[in-house]
């Protein structure tokens, strides 16, 4: 197949996904649900961050999660233990969630009984960037253990983020990561995104993530 044909197919796929994403967002708005798409590589700390958010927000908000994984229900089972309603989504060989899959997951949730929806995307820093799920905010989680050049190597996904979380700052010295460089890279690539330096071991910076969630709720509602 010629390159032009391949590009046309890709454009059609993204266009169809955008229509479904807008449909998902309209449905969430109708029911007053504020949704967040958590993106990041495997091991960046997405699941643990979501668990901590559930623990700290569940007394104030009714929370549900959609957990994307290539196989099994590992992350979904972890989140359920923290008291959230969780819908697992297995993507098989696909490296990202899409609006079609999320739309089906929404059918398994009673949206009238949900205030916040946390969607954990498949662990990947490339594919998820192009596929709007219908969420209101996108959060990208990067860890110092991935290397301090990870942010500048993945500008595409960084440009889509509303919040960039630089996680595992407590391990920066051990792995030789320059936190300031990572922070500067994030701000240079996406000046509009908020940037938070985080350690889920010491909980440094976690209050700023909570503030972002709370502020987002006020913006959307």
From Swiss-Prot:
* Residues binding Zn(2+) 2: 100, 104
The UniProt record gives the binding positions of Ni(2+) as 95-96, 127
Q: Which GO terms describe its biological process?
A: protein maturation
Annotated binding of Zn(2+) 1, by residue: 95-96, 127
Stretch list, region G-domain:
35-196
Q: Which domain of life is it from?
A: Archaea
The terms under GO molecular function for this entry are: GTP binding; GTPase activity; nickel cation binding; zinc ion binding
Q: Enumerate the UniProt keywords alphabetically.
A: GTP-binding, Hydrolase, Metal-binding, Nickel, Nucleotide-binding, Zinc
What is the role of the protein in this entry? Involved in the maturation of [NiFe] hydrogenases. Required for nickel insertion into the metal center of the hydrogenase. Exhibits a low intrinsic GTPase activity, which is essential for nickel insertion.
Q: What quaternary arrangement does the UniProt entry report?
A: Homodimer.
Q: Which family does it belong to?
A: Belongs to the SIMIBI class G3E GTPase family. HypB/HupM subfamily.
What name does the UniProt record give this protein? Probable hydrogenase maturation factor HypB
Gene from which this protein is expressed: hypB
